[in-house]
Every structure is written in C-alpha cells, then in structure tokens.
A protein has these predicted regions:
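Intrinsic low-complexity, repeat-rich intrinsically disordered segments enriched
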Residues: 1-67, 89, 94-98, 129
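Generic beta-strand structural signal
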Residues: 19, 81, 142-144
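A general structural signal for short secondary-structure junctions and capping/turn motifs
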Residues: 23, 78, 139-142, 167-168
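A broad, low-specificity signal marking well-ordered, structured residues that form hydrophobic/aromatic
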Residues: 32, 54, 106, 149, ...
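Surface-exposed ligand/attachment interfaces on beta-rich extracellular proteins
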Residues: 37-46, 55-82, 91-114, 159-171
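Terminal beta-strand-rich extracellular "head" domains
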Residues: 71, 92-153
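Substrate-binding and catalytic surfaces of secreted/luminal carbohydrate-active proteins
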Residues: 86
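Domain-scale recognition of soluble eukaryotic interaction modules
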Residues: 144-177
Length: 177
C-alpha cells in the first residue's frame, strides 16, 4: 500500500484500505464520493452521505374527522434510510375507532421529498375489505412534502381510488414495505 500526502489536509491511499477493527466515521455533510464513475448526464449528486436504521410509531388517521386508535402491540414500523431513499415497513393493527370519516392516511417515518413526484408502495390488508366493501389491491401513495401516505385501492374497473375510513374497526390490519 502506498500512502501519499495531498495538500495540507488530504491523504491518498493506493491499492485500497482494509480496517481490521472499528468504524469509519465521516463528518456531517460528507460521505462516500462516487464521482469517479460519473455515468449519466442530469445527475444531481454522486455523494452517499446518509445511512440510518430505526423504528417509528405508525399512525392511521381519518382525513376529515374522527379518530383511529392503534393497538400498542402493533404500531411500530421499521425503516432503513440510504441517502434519499427510505424503505419502511410495518404491521399496524387498529384497536378502536371513533366515527372516522374521509380518506385513510398512514404515517411515515420521514416526509416525502418535495420534488414534484409521488411515490407508491404495495400494501397488504386484513379485515379491511370485509368491513369497508373496498375490495381490490391496496397500495399507499405519498405526495410532495407529506409525512403520511394516502391509502388507495384498485378494482377491475377503477384504478387509484382513495380508501375511506367509514368501515374501519378493531383488529383491521395494514402491512406495507
């Protein structure tokens, strides 16, 4: 391995770097720079500057009125954040409801990026289709800047309908990732 000094604050390591024990710590605002492999015009960054794993409390809300109380044993979601990408999953169950009305919203660990787009994820439900008569493939859609996602469903004749809270009840279950 060749080590050389570059300028007053940099070191160049030739032939790689092996660390037998410990971590590599990067100062805030810095990361791993992949610009040496610049491939596509229009890219905005080649710096991997964030990684995080954690849990968050999952919430379901009624967009218009009423409340949805989550089962405390089934309201913890997990997430992995790599750069700007967040992969979240949960197994959330309802404990009780009090006259929920309007669209179903499910809380996310981070707000959706405000970049002019929306993002989709598949969802599995249990009990929801029986009580609400909203049958079909459920999915969640997060929009610009929202800290929650809207629950939608598809039928054989309609795509992207927003799920309504009216029929939700105890033990209804939402799972996504």
């Amino acid at each position: 391995m060749a080590i050389s000094k570059i300028g007053s604050n940099s070191v160049n390591l030739a032939s790689g770097l092996d660390i037998s024990d410990g971590n590599v710590t990067v100062a805030s605002g810095h990361g791993i720079d992949f610009s040496a492999t610049s491939d596509l015009a229009g890219k905005s960054s080649e710096l991997l500057d964030d990684y995080e794993e954690g849990t968050y409390t999952v919430t379901l809300t009624a967009a218009t009125s009423g409340t949805i109380t989550m089962n405390g044993s089934y309201n913890t979601g997990t997430y992995i954040k790599i750069g700007r990408i967040v992969i979240a999953s949960c197994d959330a169950r309802i404990s009780s409801t009090s006259s929920p009305q309007g669209n179903v919203n499910i809380g996310l660990p981070f707000a959706v990026a405000s970049d002019g787009g929306s993002y989709l994820s598949s969802m599995v439900t249990h009990g929801v289709t029986i009580q609400t008569s909203q049958q079909g493939d459920f999915f969640i859609k997060g929009n610009d800047g929202q800290s929650y996602a809207n629950v939608h469903y598809n039928t054989t004749t309609n795509l992207g309908l927003q799920a309504q809270n009216g029929g939700l009840g105890a033990n209804d279950e939402f799972q996504f990732n």
